Amino acid sequence: MNNTKTAQRKALLAAITVFVMGGVTAQAEELPVYSFDEVVVTATRTENDVKKVPASTQVITQEDIKRGGATSVRNALSMYANIFQKSKVRGGGHDIIIRGMETKHSLVMVNGRRISNEADANGLGNAMSLDRININDVEKIEIVRGPSSALYGSEAMGGVLNIITKPSKEQTLLTGLEHTSEDTSHWWHADTGRIGNFSMTLDARFNKINRSMLETATESDPYGTAQTYNASLNYYVNDHSYVNAYMDYYSQHLKTDTGTPTMKPITLTTSSGKMSLSGQAMLEGTGSKAYKQKNYGISWNGKTDKNDWQIQAYMSKFNWSTTSNTKVLGSIPPAGMEGMFNYLLQKKNTYDFNHDEHNMWAIEGRDSLRVNDHHRVTFGAEYVKEKVAGTGLGKNGDGVHSITENGTTKSSSEKTLSSYAAYLQDEIEYGKWFIVPAIRYDHHSAYGSHTSPKIGVTYNATDHFRIKANYGDGFKAPSVSQLYYDLDMEMGRGNWVHLTGNPNLKPEKSKSWDLGVEAEFGKGYGSLTYFDNDVDNLITSIPKGKDSNGHNLHRYENVNKARIKGLENTLGYRFNDTLEFKVTSTLLDAKDTSAGKDLTQRARLSQIYQLIYDDHKDTGWSAVLWNQLDYKFVTGKAWESGESVKKSYSLTNFSLTRKVNKDTRVYGSVQNIFDKKDADCDLDGRFWSIGWEHKF
C-alpha cells in the first residue's frame, strides 16, 4: 500500500513538473502552438472564448461524443470530463460529483433551462435526469466547475452542466441503431433547415432495456421501455431576432422482479423481539416504475451590435409512480410452531405504492449590454413557481386526501412554493486582465432571502499562458421533499423507511475559491488548479427511532459541515493532426468535519488517461483508448462500519468508429474490458455497445 501511495504521488508530481517545464521549453524553442479555441455561454451567460473565462470550464463537443461512441450523456461525461460518477443505490441513476461536491449540489440544465425531476431530497433527480436526455439531440455539453449561484441561484454550489441541443442548420435526415449489453435503441433526427422565416428540428428515440440481475442481488435491475420526442421551431422575425418554441416528451415504463420463486430459509421475529422462528418460505416479489416528463417553452431572442437579449417562459412537468408487491407462495414452518410461524409469515404479504408529480413554471429575462469593446454588463431576473404533489408529502402538505390501491391506503397532499431573483454581472477587459464580478439576490417563499456574490479574474500573461482565480458563495435551497416529506415506503424487500421533512431547514451554504494556471506549449497544453470549498448547513436525514408502524423513522436536519479541497490537472499532447494523448487528474481531500470522517463515494485520486486517434477522413477511422484509475475510493461502508473503507481499481476502455463514407458510420465500444466487479465500488462488470448511423 505504501508503494502504491508513493507511486501515485510520483505520478502526480511528474505531471505537474512536465506541465511547468513544458511551458518553459515551449517558449525557448518557439514551437508552433495548436489552437484550442471554443466559444462557451454557460460560465458568464454570454459568448466568450473558453480560455478567456475565469471559471474552470470544459466543453464536450459533438465530435467528442461520436468519436467516443457515447450512448448517453452520462456515458459522454465519464469519458471526457473530470467528473466522478457512481451508481445510486436506489432506482438507478448515477452520482455526479464535481470537485467532490455531491449530486444535489450540481445544477443540470438543458439549453440554459432547469428541468423538473423527482424533487428528491438526496439528488436522485439529478442522478436520473442525465439518462433521460436524448444524446442524439446534443450539440455540446458545457461543464462549469465551482460555485455558480451568482448567476444561476440554488443547486449550483458545485457547478453547472448545461446540455445544449442541436440547432437547425441545414436540411438533414439522420437515423441510427444502437445495441448494448444493457439495451437496444433506435433514433431519428430531422432538420428542415431554414425555409423562408422558419426552421425546425425533430428528434425521436426508442429504447428497450434488458432484464438483468446480479448474482448477489435479491431483485433484478429495472427493465422495460422508454421513448423520447423533441421538437424545436424557430420563426425569424428579422436578421436580428427570432422566436423559438419547443416541446420535449419522455416516457419510461419499467419492471423489477425477484426471479423464479424458490423455497429459501427465513427467520421471523415477533414485534416484541422476544421470539425468533426459523423455517423456509417461498416468496415472489414484483415492482414497477413509471416516469413521464413534459417540457414546453417559448423564447424571444435578439442580438444587435450593443445588445444580446432573451425573454422566455417555460413549463416542465414530471410524474413518477412506483409499486412494490411481495407475495407468500408457500412455507415449511418449524415443527410445533406452525401457527405462529405462518401468522408472522403472512406479514410478508405487502403492497406499497407511491404516485407523485413535480411541476415547474418559470419566466426569465436577461440582457447583455456592450458598453464598449472592453466592457459588457449582463443583468436579468426570473420568477419560478413549483408544485409538488403526491403520496411523498403524505399529510404534510395542503389538500390532504386518501388514495387506496390494492388494499393499501395512503395519504396524499400538495405544496406550492415560489421564488424570484435578480442578478447583475460586469465583464471588464483592462490590458491583460479580464475581471468578472457578479451578484445575485434570491427570495424564496419558504426560507426567505439569500445573496450570492462572486468574482473571477483571468490574467493573460502571454497569448499561451494564463492565470485564473475565482471566489464565490454558493447555496442549495432545501427541496420541497426535505421541507415537507411524509414518505413511508419499502426501500428494498421488507425494509420500511419513514422519511419526514422539516419546514425549519436553512439553505446549505458554501464559500469557495480556486487558483489555477493554463497554458499551450508547442503541441501540448495543460492546466493546474487548486480548489477549496467550505460547506455549512449540510442537510441530512437523522434516525429518530421507530414510527407507530414499527418503521425506521428519519427526519431532515441541518447538522453537517464539510471541507472539500484538492488539485485538478490536465495535461495533453498532440503528436500530429490525428493522434493526441491526454490525462486528467483530481487529487481530493473531502471531509465531513462535523463527524471527522471521509465523505463517501469519492476517490482520493481519480485519473483518466486517453489516447485519441482521428484521421478526419470521410472514409476513415477514429478510436479512443482510455483508462480510469480511482485510488482510495471511499465506499458506502465507511459510515456503516464507523471507519473509512477504501478500495483502489483501474478500468480499461476502448471505442472504435469506422466512417464508411461521408454519410454512414459504424461504431462500437467496450468499457471495463477486464470485467471487474465490486458491489462496494458499484462496478457491475463489462459494458459493450455497437451502433450504426446514416445520413440520407
Where are these regions (language model features)?
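Gram-negative outer-membrane beta-barrel transporters
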Residues: 373, 377, 428-434, 531-534, ...
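N-terminal Sec signal peptide and the immediately downstream disordered periplasmic leader
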Residues: 1-68, 75, 80, 192, ...
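Face-selective signature of the C-terminal outer-membrane beta-barrel domain
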Residues: 236-252, 277-279, 285-449, 460, ...
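Short acidic/polar hinge/loop motifs at secondary-structure boundaries
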Residues: 85, 115-145
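Extracytoplasmic beta-strand/coil segments of soluble accessory domains associated
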Residues: 74, 78-114
